[in-house]
């Protein structure tokens, strides 16, 4: 009966069915023709794997190998890669970074690339509001020294509450502890003292990152043509929406209260800066400002806590590093009257090198400098990059290139410390010490953890200070090692171009005697 009914509908509406079929056919033909025209100048990696769907699945399970193989095979040329994106994705070698960096935002858009990667069409996270970068660049970075004492106060409280006071070796899920610690100290900067210690706030801030990641992964697993039809049904996306509502319900009353306050009475934090910046960057509704805050939590808490976990896993696997790092901390603090400040943290060169080497071998992303192409342009080698394409730079492959980093797969904690000490004679006869270019927060063509150019991560200075503060206090108070029976550093988990430390693993720690 159902078949007969369907047949009758087709007969009765034959002209509608024919028109729809023609439109769909035309759209498919145009899409295929655009794809053919746009990729005729771009060789693809992984073609031996077979169909586009097989290549997409290979990207989800082993993007690292695809980026590495493409980087080695094409080296100085652009190549295509089939990813989870609905758009053509081209991978650009670092030699083109300067010329790409000179292109205006009307040609290459960082925010639209972020929207693509975060599946914003379906997640509705709206993490590309320009007020975010304005507030971080214009207020946060300039305020770090001023907020240093407040951050340290929250850190001390969090460490005393969350880390065990153990005289014997004790197993700890350090990933869970670090997520909460980072949420507390970042929260002091983002939402101020009234919220940063609140269980409701911390629960919302920590879990929004988990649920956003799960939703993006779940959507990305679907073939692109199925996403418009099936994404809304995904339980991960529903969980994200519910969590977004909870975050907004926590932030909304605080925002309403802040708006009613006199400007001079408002606390010195990101909430206030965003409210104040509306004069320059346009009015936002309370709902939009809550979404902006949510975006900040996604960007800051998840990534920083993962970097911290990677650092702790490295220390647990290589406890022989601890005495040298601890001695540097002791020496530097003695020289700065025992004060942990931005200045004293910057003086801890070996600790800085350890973090940079951690990020080199265990970056949060396998690709960097993502940009959406808004207008077709031609590179200096003649390769045409079409409008609509998504650009990536194979950062992890670059950072493990033996031509750039000797013995690149070996973790050398003081690799960048040694480079900082090297002196180079410049053309004018002056001496240059390679300090700044090899600092953890520095971004250059060979070190792309924080991106590159004018859109490099504006929050990297806060992240660096937080990571160093956590390690300074921990290393002065605790010993650390892997679990008994474990002899190698825990492997990271990877999906597509995302890489995270395994959050289920435990390490052992005990109070320093």
UniProtKB/Swiss-Prot annotation:
InterPro entries per the UniProt record, alphabetical: Cyt_P450, Cyt_P450_CS, Cyt_P450_E_grp-IV, Cyt_P450_sf
Q: Its Gene Ontology molecular function terms?
A: heme binding; iron ion binding; monooxygenase activity; oxidoreductase activity, acting on paired donors, with incorporation or reduction of molecular oxygen
The positions making up the signal sequence are: 1-19
Please list the cofactors this protein needs: heme
Keyword field: Glycoprotein, Heme, Iron, Metal-binding, Monooxygenase, Oxidoreductase, Signal
GO terms (BP aspect):
secondary metabolic process
Q: What is its EC number?
A: 1.-.-.-
Residues carrying sugar = 37, 139, 173
Pathway given in the UniProt record: Mycotoxin biosynthesis
Q: Which CDD domains match?
A: CYP503A1-like
Q: Name one Pfam family in it.
A: p450
> What does the function comment of this entry state?
Cytochrome P450 monooxygenase; part of the core atranone cluster (CAC) which products are predicted to catalyze most or all steps of mycotoxin atranone synthesis, starting from geranylgeranyl pyrophosphate (GGPP). The initial cyclization of GGPP to dolabellane is probably performed by the terpene cyclase ATR13. The Baeyer-Villiger oxidation near the end of the atranone synthesis, which converts atranones D and E to atranones F and G is predicted to be catalyzed by the monooxygenase ATR8. Of the CAC's other predicted gene products, the reducing PKS ATR6 might synthesize a polyketide chain.
User: What family name appears in the similarity comment?
Assistant: Belongs to the cytochrome P450 family.
Write the protein's name.
Answer: Cytochrome P450 monooxygenase ATR2
